[in-house]
Amino acid sequence: MPLDLKSRIYKAQTIGNVEPIEHMIPYPNLRSLIDGQNIKYGERVVYKDYNLTSSIIYDKAQQIANWLQSKGIQPKERVLVKPMAFPFSVIIPFGIWTLGASIVIDNDDDTEKAIKKTNSKIVLRDDKIINESEKFPTHYEPRYKPLLEDEAAVLIKNSIGYQYSNYNLLVNTNGILQEIDLFSDQSLSLFPMVMVG
């Protein structure tokens, strides 16, 4: 096979900055994929305005996972998250996923109905969680490593729940990154929303 064609096939199988060798063979679960990406891109600034690197987000997510575990939340359980300010709205879901749990987002703003429909175990209402979680270790030892096919999120809109797997979110995120032309060597500036190369 000509090298050019081989390179094009390899690039076509790449999801964002996750090369096929990383998501097809050695990473059977989400945790392994994220660990690999953090080793590779940990010091890269992701959100320039907040000076947040992948490593900082990764450490905070592990603290959140430890905090959730201390609250009795188990892997595969659902956690309802109310709207929060950025960057907490990004860090907290990663903490939930680090634990191996699933996030519930209720666009209908009917908390009681969402809890009943999804059997959510806890409702996270504000960003004080970040402060509470800071006393927990930045290393989380997973008891369960979610597979790419496991549920990652439930989005409730117009009383209908839409269920997404880790793989669904990975592919959708990749599609968005390609649409806005944001690549692995760039950071995102949020004020105003522009790409920084």
Residue ranges and their predicted role:
Residues 1-52, 56-71, 75, 99, ...:
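N-lobe entry segment of adenylate-forming
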Residues 66, 94, 174, 178:
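Short, well-ordered alpha-helices that flank and scaffold nucleotide-derived cofactor binding pockets
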Residues 80-83, 89-93, 97-126, 163, ...:
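Short beta-strand->loop structural element characteristic of the AMP-binding/adenylate-forming
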Residues 82-87, 93, 151, 156-159, ...:
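Conserved AMP-binding
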Residues 87-88, 110, 171, 196:
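Short alpha-helical
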Residues 119-122, 134, 138, 169, ...:
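Conserved helix-loop-beta element of the AMP-binding
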